[in-house]
Amino acid sequence: RFRKLFSVIEVFDSADFGLPQHRKRMIAGDFPVDLLNSYKTQIPKINFSEVLKSLSAKKTIRDPNYGFEIPADDVTELENEANLTDIETRINRDAKTFHTIYNNMSFPDKLDRPSRTITATCTRVSRESIIINSSNGFRRLNIREKGVLQGFPLTYQFYGNSYSSKNKMIGNAVPPILTYYIFQSMLETKTLELKHPRDSSYFHNIPNEKVKPSKLGMPNKKYPASRTFKFAVPHLRFGSGVRFELSNVAKTKWSFKFFYGSSKNIKSISLNNDLFKLIEPIILKNKTSNFEVTINDLIEEYKDYTSKGFQDVWVSQSENAVAFKFIDLVGSCVNEIVNSINWDKINDDLIPNIINEKNKKLTDNKESILTGFYLLSLLNTKVLSK
């Protein structure tokens, strides 16, 4: 609608302009865009690791973006929040590396490149959170690390009333380094005459007003009774939204589900007793070793964990990992069953007949898919439906 008002409407990645963060944003305006884009070849790139290394110095810290140095004691907001708990680590790892729908991400984040995009809001267990190794575990970034990744000088102060408000200030900002280069293009600075901020003798004085210390993020101690659980089962995650998952419908009814199809047309089938009765004779007829003992042991261990039981421990303050242990054991059991069946004798048309359509991805993974139908339908009936 307003396109005619601007000569330039283009998406830029700030990492191309030396910011140690991948940050793609649309910019509209009137400036020499070809000149701006030509700067990319002359701008030195900074990786995530360089930022972390600079900020870990004990005596003198050098600003990785602007090049000036100040005593480490003068740098504020370097306090780290508590490491992720084991449950928080598992949730983050699964959300990033085995998300039920979206593409996989690294966990922890890779340091040999610019960081992922800093966001204004993220919790300790969000897919968007940037997670790095810490002593004895994993942690989120502190305020200063985020500020430097966003291009703010070491001496810049964030006068927020809370930890979350400072995160919002940083995450909602336009990187100063990108605006510097846009301004240089508007000044028509030639590419070969361009100076990087580190070479421009820039120094941002420390303000006289002291920044208020923030209460750092901590693990949750209480969870609502309606806390949700939605995670794919190990060995039953096939990418592009195709997966078996354990989740709690209506916040209390726990069950295994199977999803397939495209991102625009997700489908599912019911993992119920009828499906189990259809699959069981085929599986048992073609088994090459006895795996029923493992299944019976699994059912026996979780016989007292009804849907309510799983929900009770999932919202408990102790952060009992029962649900994750359950899906891990289920995944191991799936792997054992897959290796105990003579699959050559099972018709490739079985899956298309069950879902009433042909699906190459499901057929290519028929061993795991059919095992999932068999085992998870049984567990829905014997454990979760009680």
What are these regions (language model features)?
Residues 1-111:
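Class I S-adenosyl-L-methionine
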